[in-house]
Amino acid sequence: MAPARENVSLFFKLYCLTVMTLVAAAYTVALRYTRTTAEELYFSTTAVCITEVIKLLISVGLLAKETGSLGRFKASLSENVLGSPKELAKLSVPSLVYAVQNNMAFLALSNLDAAVYQVTYQLKIPCTALCTVLMLNRTLSKLQWISVFMLCGGVTLVQWKPAQATKVVVAQNPLLGFGAIAIAVLCSGFAGVYFEKVLKSSDTSLWVRNIQMYLSGIVVTLAGTYLSDGAEIQEKGFFYGYTYYVWFVIFLASVGGLYTSVVVKYTDNIMKGFSAAAAIVLSTIASVLLFGLQITLSFALGALLVCVSIYLYGLPRQDTTSIQQEATSKERIIGV
């Protein structure tokens, strides 16, 4: 088994952060498209459930590759999954919260404009920072707190757009959307930090932890599926309304979820939030190049704030020990 905090290269960390954020940006756009088209609307709860199944299968395959032999693979599953009901119960907490978060994200995107969703969802950054301080007993400097809130303001400006008429008229409930996004923000902060605490508090394999979480996640999401849409699913079918675009959204959600666990393992949840915000800026720039989107003053200012906030957060914290020792020495000299 790998140690709880393995030393990995900076390139690997940057690679994981980059892939995760690019996938997240594509996921938001694709998800919004599938929820606002005039076609038959699929059940979002079934998509969340299928995503959990795919992530479980991929994690099982990666654990098999990590163990290197069928015997060690079976032993690992027997010891850490089948023979560890307490660990399964421990990992059921984030899976339950993540399931709620995913369903709230679907609900919010169905009732809010994509830009409004992205802006309000950035509140997960200070929420995650607060959970990190409270749950992991870490401290953030004043400069880091400033950078966290500066990032929220920057992303808001980047995505600020005047109200426009959409081609597809969809019935929306903004109040319901904002309520859903508030729950999603709280779930994101708590579940992410809780999972980080579990990952880094033992030497258990990342893929074992994922399997433990996704097993309970499948049970939770499957139950939620039939509690929410059971009658309609029985009438129309589990895969009602599914298209290639819907399967693409599920694929993006699965890949993004796996990369997120790797990022949490080797960096932290706050860095994950900063990386996601940077991806929003990059995706907007790509829209300028590909689709002729006009750069606005608010975007330029917001992008600058995002870059500055990332730089400020990444600055090494000043070691005050030597300064305090020097001050104490001077006081002693003066006293003499």
Swiss-Prot record:
Biological processes annotated in GO: CMP-N-acetylneuraminate biosynthetic process; CMP-N-acetylneuraminate transmembrane transport; N-acetylneuraminate metabolic process
GO cellular component term of the entry, any: Golgi membrane
Tissue/organ expression: Ubiquitous. Found in all the tissues examined including skeletal muscle, brain, heart, liver, kidney and spleen.
Signal peptide: none
Ranges in the topological domain labelled Lumenal: 31-45, 109-114, 161-175, 229-243, 289-296
Cytoplasmic side: 1-9, 65-87, 136-141, 197-209, 263-269, 316-336
Keywords: Antiport, Golgi apparatus, Membrane, Sugar transport, Transmembrane, Transmembrane helix, Transport
Membrane topology: Multi-pass membrane protein
GO molecular function: antiporter activity; CMP-N-acetylneuraminate transmembrane transporter activity
Keyword Nuclease annotated: no
Pfam family, one: Nuc_sug_transp
Transmembrane segments: 10-30, 46-64, 88-108, 115-135, 142-160, 176-196, 210-228, 244-262, 270-288, 297-315
Effect of residue 256 to N: Loss of CMP-sialic acid transport activity but no effect on CDP-ribitol transport activity
Region: Disordered, residue numbers: 316-336
Catalysis: reaction(s): CMP-N-acetyl-beta-neuraminate(in) + CMP(out) = CMP-N-acetyl-beta-neuraminate(out) + CMP(in); CMP-N-acetyl-beta-neuraminate(in) + AMP(out) = CMP-N-acetyl-beta-neuraminate(out) + AMP(in); CDP-L-ribitol(in) + CDP(out) = CDP-L-ribitol(out) + CDP(in); UMP(out) + CMP-N-acetyl-beta-neuraminate(in) = UMP(in) + CMP-N-acetyl-beta-neuraminate(out)
Residue sites binding CMP-N-acetyl-beta-neuraminate per the record: 55, 101-102, 117-124, 188, 210-214, 272
Outcome reported for the amino acid change (mutating residue 118 to A): No effect on CDP-ribitol and CMP-sialic acid transport activity
Outcome when changing residue 122 to A: No effect on CDP-ribitol and CMP-sialic acid transport activity
Phenotype upon changing residue 184 to Y: Loss of CMP-sialic acid transport activity but no effect on CDP-ribitol transport activity
Record's subcellular location: Golgi apparatus membrane
Family: Belongs to the nucleotide-sugar transporter family. SLC35A subfamily.
Summary of subunit composition and partner proteins: Monomer.
Task of the protein: Transports CMP-sialic acid from the cytosol into the Golgi apparatus, functioning as an antiporter that exchanges CMP-sialic acid for CMP. Binds both CMP-sialic acid and free CMP, but has higher affinity for free CMP. Also able to exchange CMP-sialic acid for AMP and UMP. Also mediates the transport of CDP-ribitol.
The protein's name in its UniProt record: CMP-sialic acid transporter
Lineage, uppermost ranks: Eukaryota, Metazoa, Chordata, Craniata, Vertebrata
